[in-house]
Amino acid sequence: MSTNKINKKSIARIAAVQALYQNILQNNYDMYDIMQNILACYHSNNSIDLPKNFKISLSISHFKMLVKSVFENINKLDEIIDNHLTNAKDSVHMPILLRALLRVSICELLFCSTTPAKVVINEYTDIANDLLNEHEIGFVNSILDKIAQENNKIS
């Protein structure tokens, strides 16, 4: 029997998006408590419906680094997101999950990644593909690509 695994950093990225989403939903509830709850969930696999031979574990250090970096740069991240919207009111009406995903992905792309930009873009586009609608997936891919180009992360 083989054991299937998903990259630990990929799981950390998903968990970071979950933490930011939960933080927004709970009106900036204590991020430390949210992080602990998410880590406990992933540690126990209690709320994850997977085949028994499928193992999920996350890179705790990558998860904590992403969440901490988002909060250290949250105003700058929101400014970057808002600057890439075509309409100012889009910011107010942006779905919470989309905003959480953009905050984490842009943060990793610009402020805390030794991972190549193309890998970051692909990872978050894959996450978006699992969580968002078709229009939002294209938007995530487009905005990350533009930001990477603007910051000379890719040519």
From Swiss-Prot:
Keywords: RNA-binding, Transcription, Transcription antitermination, Transcription regulation. The keyword Ribonucleoprotein does not apply. Gene3D superfamilies: NusB-like. Signal peptide: none annotated. InterPro entries: NusB-like_sf, NusB_fam, NusB_RsmB_TIM44. One of its GO terms (molecular function) is RNA binding. Pfam families: NusB. One of its GO terms (biological process) is transcription antitermination. One of its GO terms (cellular component) is cytosol. Belongs to the NusB family. This is Transcription antitermination protein NusB. It comes from Rickettsia prowazekii (strain Madrid E). The lineage of its organism: Bacteria, Pseudomonadati, Pseudomonadota, Alphaproteobacteria, Rickettsiales. The gene is nusB.
